[in-house]
Amino acid sequence: MEGVMSNYPDGIAIICANNDDMAVAAARAAKNNPAYDNTVFLGFDGQISAAQAILDGELSMTTAQNPYDMAYKAVEAMVQYLNGEEVEEVIDSGYTIVTAETAQEHIDKLKSYSEK
């Protein structure tokens, strides 16, 4: 992030990281740089720590995948393939965008999985 801020001293619109930890780290690195006050910091994975960072005002949003649906659709496609059926080239397993409005609900949902 230091390199980005050095190369773009006037700020940029969005930082889109490959995962939540990288997005949170980038947001924290830019925290004291006023040129980045309006930058959107986006992570991927929908981790509890990212949702908490959203509630704390550190991260703008994250995108959460649904691992159950990803696995289910993968097995479903494999069965279709093994049965000689045509398999879609692209299979969308869905996602959820987690923002300040939905972060607490997302945290509660993830925590409920470990309570079962």
Which residues fall in each region the model found?
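A residue-level marker of the well-folded mature domains of exported/periplasmic proteins
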Residues: M1-K116
